């Protein structure tokens, strides 16, 4: 069934290119996340400018647009190598969306969704790693960075045949977080709790 894989890659890219952060903000009458807050059209920035409900909607949609193309290809019998490329295509679409002038998010939620069809055990470990990192540090970006660094080792342990494509995904996520890494190093990164407090503060 790898004959259909190139078409699935293209479809995954198109799915990834649907920027839920921009669409949710438009529907909810919120500022454009590309020019507000951190300027990143992702769930964390929507949390900053729009609150929890909008952020959850963005998060769920971003996970699904990574999960559904990979899960569909998996059910059609596509081989692990091509599944990895389909997952990468969904994340590339999220990061450089053709529908929104190639200005997208950082791909964390979409990458998580793309990895999820590999197995729920892996999904649980990955989610736990991100959550623990955020709870201990207060930085959403650090949770993403730590998860991206550890993900290839988790995959090697649970499903070694997917190690290479997941490693490629991790590299992509880390590259997209280079600004966050610099801010963390300089201790200039904003903690997620601070974002929530600013949102709740009276105007």
From Swiss-Prot:
UniProt entry tagged with the keyword Hydrolase: no
Domain of life: Bacteria
Pathway entry: Lipid metabolism; phospholipid metabolism
E.C. number: 2.3.1.275
MF GO annotations: acyl-phosphate glycerol-3-phosphate acyltransferase activity
Swiss-Prot/TrEMBL catalytic activity: an acyl phosphate + sn-glycerol 3-phosphate = a 1-acyl-sn-glycero-3-phosphate + phosphate
GO CC list: plasma membrane
Location(s) in or outside the cell: Cell inner membrane
TM helices/strands, residue ranges: 4-24, 56-76, 80-100, 112-132, 138-158
Main location (coarse class): membrane
Keyword Endoplasmic reticulum assigned: no
InterPro entries registered for this protein in UniProt: G3P_acylTferase_PlsY
Pfam families recorded: G3P_acyltransf
Keywords: Cell inner membrane, Cell membrane, Lipid biosynthesis, Lipid metabolism, Membrane, Phospholipid biosynthesis, Phospholipid metabolism, Transferase, Transmembrane, Transmembrane helix
Membrane topology, from the record: Multi-pass membrane protein
Alphabetical GO biological process terms: phospholipid biosynthetic process
NCBIfam families: glycerol-3-phosphate 1-O-acyltransferase PlsY (TIGR00023)
Family of this protein: Belongs to the PlsY family.
Subunit details: Probably interacts with PlsX.
Summary of the function given for this chain in its UniProt record: Catalyzes the transfer of an acyl group from acyl-phosphate (acyl-PO(4)) to glycerol-3-phosphate (G3P) to form lysophosphatidic acid (LPA). This enzyme utilizes acyl-phosphate as fatty acyl donor, but not acyl-CoA or acyl-ACP.
Protein name per the record: Glycerol-3-phosphate acyltransferase
Gene of this entry: plsY
């Amino acid at each position: 069934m790898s004959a259909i894989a190139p078409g699935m890659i293209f479809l995954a890219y198109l799915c990834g290119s649907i920027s839920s952060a921009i669409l949710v903000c438009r529907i909810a009458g919120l500022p454009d996340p590309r020019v507000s807050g951190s300027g990143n059209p992702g769930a964390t920035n929507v949390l900053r400018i729009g609150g929890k409900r909008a952020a959850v909607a963005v998060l769920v949609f971003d996970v699904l647009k990574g999960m559904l193309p990979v899960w569909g290809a998996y059910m059609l019998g596509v081989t692990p190598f091509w599944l990895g490329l389909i997952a990468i295509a969904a994340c590339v679409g999220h990061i450089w969306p053709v529908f929104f002038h190639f200005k997208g998010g950082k791909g964390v939620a979409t990458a998580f969704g793309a990895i999820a069809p590999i197995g729920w055990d892996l999904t649980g470990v990955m989610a736990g790693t991100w959550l623990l990192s955020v709870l201990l540090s207060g930085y959403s970006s650090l949770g993403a960075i730590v998860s991206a660094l550890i993900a290839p080792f988790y995959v090697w342990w649970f499903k070694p045949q997917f190690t290479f494509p997941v490693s490629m995904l991790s590299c992509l996520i880390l590259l997209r977080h280079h600004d966050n890494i610099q801010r963390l190093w300089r201790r200039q990164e904003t903690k997620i709790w601070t974002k929530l407090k600013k949102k709740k503060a009276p105007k």
